[in-house]
Amino acid sequence: MSFNIANKKITIIGLQKSGVAAAQLASMNGAHVFVSDLIENEITKKNYQELTKNNINCEIGKHTDQIFESDLWVISPGVPKNIKIIKKAESLDIQ
C-alpha cells in the first residue's frame, strides 16, 4: 500500500532519531513538515538546528497549535500514546 504525501501537511511529534528521519523522508517526498518536541535538551537542540538548516519547520520546548494544522501525524516511538495532544488530534480526525 502506498500513500502519496506530496503537498500534505505532516506533523511529527518527537525530535529524536526517528523523528528526524521521518521529517527528512517526508520532506524529500514533497510534504510540508512540522516537527514538535516538548523536551528541550542537547539532542533536540542539535536536531532542531539540523532540520531548520534544511528548511524543515520545528519547535522545541512546547507544542503550539500549529501541530493541529495537519493532514497526518507521525508519532515517534518514545512518545506516550495517551497524552492530551494525541487525543485532541484524534478528535480532529488527524490521521
Question: Where do the PLM segments sit?
Answer:
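N-terminal leader/targeting and accessory segments in enzymes
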Residues: 1-95
